[in-house]
Amino acid sequence: MLVAYYELKERLLVPHTAAEQEIAEAPQSSDDKLWAHILLSLDMNDKWRSPELSLTSFAEQLSSNRTYVGDAFKRNTEMTFVEYITHRRIDYVVETLKSKPDVNIHELFNYVGYRQRSTAWRNFQKVTGMTPHEFLERIK
């Protein structure tokens, strides 16, 4: 499950123009087109960071429905929409802490879309297996 997520993460590091060109050139099924549209939409203006982001609101933005979009996440990542967004946010936090260990963790959690400290810490521990402080101690 995490392998699929990290493979997707690597693909997302491709600049938008190259990704859009690759998508346009490749023959795709309607499921592939939806998935490509989902990934581009999440990256556009960093929608994945929005605290208001929900499967329902995101599906509406795509002019689709929550079941179809949710199924696309399961099919392509073996994760639910919420799990994918959680991993994406925590992965951003981890990478930022590795490069800037002195950053204010509360501001960083807020930046990636967490309103509640307890939710951010719980999700960080769930994804990484350690608290943010334990993580910082390991990388220092």
Task: Describe the function of each predicted region.
Residues 5-110, 123-126, 130-140:
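Membrane-proximal linker segments that couple transmembrane helices to downstream signaling/catalytic modules
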Residues 113:
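ABC-family nucleotide-binding domains
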Residues 66, 116-118:
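The DNA-contacting recognition helix of HTH DNA-binding domains
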Residues 1-3:
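Hydrophobic cores of alpha-helical transmembrane segments in multi-pass inner/ER membrane proteins
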